[in-house]
Amino acid sequence: MSQILLQPANAMITLENVNKWYGQFHVLKNINLTVQPGERIVLCGPSGSGKSTTIRCINHLEEHQQGRIVVDGIELNEDIRNIERVRQEVGMVFQHFNLFPHLTVLQNCTLAPIWVRKMPKKEAEDLAVHYLERVRIAEHAHKFPGQISGGQQQRVAIARSLCMKPKIMLFDEPTSALDPEMVKEVLDTMIGLAQSGMTMLCVTHEMGFARTVADRVIFMDRGEIVEQAAPDEFFAHPKSERTRAFLSQVIH
């Protein structure tokens, strides 16, 4: 049976004592996190710290073994209907674009609204054009992914997620696979999205983006949340030695 639960202070996302293992490896250790509507969170930390696993658990791409995850009042549990409902409200952009190479940019963006939300084709196309314009790439709507740059493909991936009208956007190192000259165009798109009031969680090493956009920066290491604070406090006065060591490596 579908279950709708109250969350702390009308939170959009709540993780309570979340644990996950890969075999014997304890990848997430008692993660507690509350995200309010419209809040913009940046997760940072060294490779293998559990950042990506944390956000992938939020839309059940990874399954947690202990604890509770509640998204927009819906608990993620074994009920497949709950998982499907959450996924309709959560967009995700990955390191790699995962666009269908045999479909045009426009078709990539209309596929999910037509098949999942049962949207009429014309309405889905109008919506796709709207979001392609928003990410400044509408002129490429009828091209195939292989005909545009990596940065442009990542902006298409963002538009594709927005076409499902999500309440939450998750970004898993969206610029890490891009050439340096393409990073800015994707970050600018994400900054515009953040300014629109979208609830966002972003795993990234782009500390300039974190300073500009985040309401809160969370540092993870060895499967734990080590430290979290507003950007000014986080970067100026990190409390943990582990945080200071990490920042010394990524800020030049």
Swiss-Prot record:
It is a peripheral membrane protein. GO terms for molecular function: ABC-type amino acid transporter activity; ATP binding; ATP hydrolysis activity. GO terms for cellular component: ATP-binding cassette (ABC) transporter complex; ATP-binding cassette (ABC) transporter complex, substrate-binding subunit-containing; membrane. Gene3D superfamilies: P-loop containing nucleotide triphosphate hydrolases. Residues 13-247 form the ABC transporter domain. ATP binds at G45, P46, S47, G48, S49, G50, K51, S52. It comes from the Bacteria. Belongs to the ABC transporter superfamily. This is Uncharacterized amino-acid ABC transporter ATP-binding protein YhdZ.
